Amino acid sequence: MSRKIINSPTDFKNIIGEFLGSTDWKLITQKEINSFAEATEDYQWIHVNTEKVITDSPFKKTIAHGYYSLSLIPKLSSEIWECKNLKLILNYGTEKIRFISPVICNSFIRASIMVLDAKDYKGGILLTSKVTIEIKNNEKPALIAETLSLLYQ
């Protein structure tokens, strides 16, 4: 996968509606799930108890936190596109987040991004993107969200 190169933040205005691409598949491990649980102090058994899930979970394996998948968006986005002449990018928010399918431990995920909007805002460009986190060999995605990023040149 090669990254889409954007020359400047204002150039996003010219590619509204364009599909920017998808990442390579990324394995989601129990180690990563446990690290996220530790960082957020969310130790719900469905995420961390590898024995209890065998008997008490419909998935029979642990699942990643929905917010873990969401938190991967900035890293995965950087694999899809790079903006030259960019001094700073700020996370401005996320809208319309839907956690559709659980990410079962040892599944592979990838992100796909489409530019929904780009407009002048607060001296920068407010970029709205549709991000889909897919699960390999799963009909439905893990999540779909509209991310807002403020880009400064």
Where are these regions (language model features)?
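HotDog/MaoC-like acyl-thioester-processing domains
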Residues: 1-15, 103-153
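Compositionally biased, intrinsically disordered low-complexity segments
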Residues: 49, 92, 128-130
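Hot-dog-fold acyl-thioester-processing enzymes
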Residues: 2-90
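Short alpha-helix capping/helix-loop boundary micro-motifs
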Residues: 94-99
